[in-house]
Amino acid sequence: MDKYEEIKTIGKGSFGRAILVKRKSDGLLLVLKEINVMEMQPKERSDAMNEVNLLSMLDHENIIGYYDSFILNGCLYIIMEYANAGDINLEIKKRTLQNKTFSEFEILSWFSQICKALQYISSRNILHRDLKTQNIFLSIVNGDYFIKLGDFGIAKILNSETSLASTVLGTPYYLSPELIQNEKGYDHKSDIWSLGCVLYELTTLKHAFNAANLPALVLKILKGTYPPIPSHYSNDLRNLISSMLQIDPKNRPSVNDILELPFINQYLGIPLKPFDSNLNENNNDSLNISNNSSGSNNSASNNISSSTEVKDQKFQNIPLAMARNINNNNNNNNNNNNNNNNNNNNNNNNNNNNNNNNNNNNNNNNKSNVDDVNSSSTTTTSSSIVKSKVNTTVSPPLSPKKPITTTTTKTTSLKTTPSIKPTLVKTPTIKSSLVKTPLSKTPISGTKNPTTSKITPSIKTPLPKAPISSKTPTRLVSKPTTPKITTPKSTSTMITPKRTTTTTTTPTPTTATTTPKKSSLSSSSSSSVKPPPPTTTTTTPSKDRSSVNTINKPMASNLSSQISSSSSSSSSSNSQFRPTTPSKERMSPTSTSTKSPTNPSPTLSSSSSLPKSSLKSDSLCTSPPRFSNTTGSSGGIGVSGNGNSNVNSTVLNRSVSSLSIQHKPTNSGSSSISSSSSGNNSNSNTTTNNNTTSTTPIRPGLKSTKSMLELSTPTSISTSNKSTTTTPTSSRSNTPSTGRLSLTTSIPRPPSSNGSNTGSSSSTTTTPTKISTTSSSSSLNKLTTPIKSSTTTSTTASTNSQTIKKSITPIKVTSQQVDSTISNIKNNIVIGNSVSTKTNISVISHLSPSIKPLPTQSIITQLPTSASTASTASTTNTTLTSGTNTMTTKKRTDFKLDDLGHRSKLNSVKLSSKSSSPIKTSSSSSSSSSSSSSITDKKSINRVKLNNLKEKNKEIINNIKISSTIPKPSNINSSSSSAFSDLNSSGSSSLNNSLTSSSSSIITNQNNQNNQNNQNNQNNQNNLKIINELILQNNLNNSISKENLDDKRLHSRANALRHFCSSIFGEDKFKETYNLLKSQSPSTSNNEIVDIASIENQLSQLIGDKIYYLKYLQQLIYCESQI
């Protein structure tokens, strides 16, 4: 570093910076790259060293030169050549700001030098892999531009001629398709793609492939789509770019093929001058102007003064000369553009560009007094025309009294008489080279001597108008006339309202309106007007025109039927047919609903809406319904609906009777049961006396004498004197008239058992509808529920056994209630009192004879669900209906004995366990006043047996009190069932045995549970041992993995130090120094001093002044010793 003087930092990267330095020995400017290799990963460190090795191998005039490299303080320093003119990317940015493109000469001069550099590295099997404009540097040497290819940081040396690389690197704008796909690898053709992108960017100043995001950019590259190249470049250059940007690498040319092209080979060795030093000469050379200039240009330049306007005129002559050159090649488009840029006073009233060019040429003839006309008019093809212009408009050329000074203003000073000031003539002329029709050779009509005559600008030549009108389409601008009704955006002929067979449309493009009394929509309309969509319309203004579409009529009818099914408005039962009326917003103001003879809307009867009604039961008819003349809709079961009734006509097929019940709980705790039944006799109606008025509103004009009850057996219908109902039967009533019964009852809680009851009872409902019916036959079974004395029961139609089973709800009983009840039974048995005078048990009765009764044990052992109903049942008195006499005394006695034994057993267990948790049992039991006598006969026996039981089981009870476990309900239930069987067979004697067996089973279960707890504890201890072992194993694995991680770090550091030291000392000296330091093995203090001194002498001879880097070698040896 002492040999170089740092000037400034010219670039920074992630691991270092580029510094401009000056060599102190000769003052040469160089670039010093400082790279911190100690902070790099091994891959990045190898890339840095790779660049050093590559630069040291390369020596070419178009590649950045390599001078030296060294490592200092953990940083790698590379000394390389300095490119004093920046890079190509900087030049492209300058041209973009100046809005100037590169000439083809500049592009190909640079491109040939880049190809030479690529040819050189390809010959050494080196891929650059990051070829872009930022890595192509410019250097000015002896006043000429030279290309310098640099930045070989990610270059790769191929091992053989046919090897392929497989790493995706480089800038995304210049990536080749094979690099993106990374499937088959890539070779030198990938650098050709990047070179094509660079060449495209030189021609257009833009990237060939550019997008807003990376996926879009990748898609464009894979498709190979790029904007076209400007047309002012040669076809050879455009074809070359196209061949280099081929998707298939095999179709791309090699570097040798490109350099062998004739138009590329001619630029090899030609120096390129800097752009800022002599831009004008450079442009003249690039356009080859000197070869095309004539002697007349020299004579014309003598008359131009050396003012500031002369420079402007000179720059303006450059595109004129280019236009002359292009005109010789039959390119008239560029000629017209250049002439338009040179003239400032052209007349733009005419739309033909050729006439403007001719006007500009004539203005130049009137303004300038120049000998050579070719300097201002370069498109003439006839020499005779030029001579006539000279004789008529230009004075003698060599007269010293006639100088002209050309300025950028609109006025020119001409040599004229003092009294006359010439004006600019804006006369359009047409030359034979631009207009195909021949013209006269006189260039200006009406002017012969411009120096003596004054010509006004209003004089125009009418000759060129004829050929223009015949060749070019004109725009006719007419005065605004009376507006006509036409179709917007239509090029057809306008149709006047006089013709009645066509439709004159208004400016609204989507609606076709008709003119009243003048025109109508018909099939013979004009072809210029599109036919309207096929709709049924009429031409009379009073009718509906196009609001109702025949396609939408079924949908409208369905919509009307759905609306009519939920409406509650009343209508007459004999109402007429009413068709579908379209919605008001789709109708015109004058439209009325009319019948459609081809597609009439269906009748909105009660049977037409049956498929759409939400029926939740199986009470629908299987036969197709008949249509009636009334309109309405049938409601579903259990919901309010509107229906019509016609006594004389059968609406539904009554061949199949159906019945359904829906249980709907309400907010107040009541339930709504809705049943429906149909019978064969549809005309049987029952008239009742109206003692209780229904709360259903009766609309005026509706009959209220028809009953809604149609039962399966007409003879079984009976009514009570206190509970009647009156339901209207009009077409808009809220109760369906299709033979369905809708009852709403108030039930405090569902029944838990069922029994038969044939007696009739008068009952009233508590719901607002107050509909109640009674039945005296077996077909109407009663659901009797135990309720308080303040509530009444309600009757419904008979149901099947499956519905009754679903309605049974278990009752939850608390432990306090069980304790009080068992204690009462115990006291009654011991003291001898009657059970009926002490117990308060809710008896639930009773199943109908037609339904199979449930088993006794399943009723008693039913799981509880509600505590509120149980408390009500335990506090109220026993309620029995008049139908309990159907139960036999034997069944009641057996049932009571079973219940008594079960409760006695539960009482003993409850007293012994003293458990706080509630014991699950069933509160559903049946009692009767007739069963008290049988229990009283055995009270003395039960008292003696109970005393003996207490003495014999005292020890068992004490053991149960000590135990903390609670017996399972399943064990209690199983022991209860055994106690019931023993009690039924042997009376009170078997009760003792059942209690003893139940106590022993409880003890056995307790022992089993203790054993299970011990086993669970043992399993938990085993699991803890396993968990501890797993934790130890995990810690051991973590320590091992940590040691492996440390070894891995030591390995990576040792490899980095070995590579670093090898690059510093060289491979041979590194091995010798490494072996020398590693062989050092101190034994004693004296020997250690002698060894160190001898080793230092040897090291100084081996490495010389690089002894500073021995510390890195020592670190390497230390890392290897720790691994």
Swiss-Prot record:
Where is composition skewed (Polar residues) in this entry?
Answer: 440-459, 654-665
One Gene Ontology cellular component: cytoplasm
Q: Does the keyword ATP-binding apply?
A: yes
According to its UniProt record, which reaction does this protein catalyse?
L-seryl-[protein] + ATP = O-phospho-L-seryl-[protein] + ADP + H(+); L-threonyl-[protein] + ATP = O-phospho-L-threonyl-[protein] + ADP + H(+)
Q: Which residues bind ATP?
A: I10, G11, K12, G13, S14, F15, G16, R17, A18, K33
**Pfam families documented for this protein:** Pkinase
Supply the SUPFAM superfamilies for this chain. Answer: Protein kinase-like (PK-like) (SSF56112)
**Which keywords belong to this entry?**
ATP-binding, Kinase, Nucleotide-binding, Serine/threonine-protein kinase, Transferase
Q: Where is this region: Disordered?
A: 283-310, 325-415, 440-802, 866-887, 908-937, 990-1020
List the biased-composition ranges (Low complexity): 283-307, 327-415, 478-529, 557-576, 588-617, 642-653, 666-696, 712-738, 752-802, 908-935
The Protein kinase domain, residue ranges? 4-264
Which residues does the entry assign to the active site, renumbered to this chain? D130
Molecular-function GO terms, alphabetical: ATP binding; protein serine kinase activity; protein serine/threonine kinase activity
Tell me the GO BP annotations in alphabetical order.
DNA damage response
Could you tell me the EC number(s) of this protein? 2.7.11.1
Q: Which InterPro entries match?
A: Kinase-like_dom_sf, NEK_Ser/Thr_kinase_NIMA, Prot_kinase_dom, Protein_kinase_ATP_BS, Ser/Thr_kinase_AS
The keyword Transferase appears for this protein: yes
Q: Which family does it belong to?
A: Belongs to the protein kinase superfamily. NEK Ser/Thr protein kinase family. NIMA subfamily.
Q: Would you tell me the protein name for this molecule? A: Probable serine/threonine-protein kinase nek3
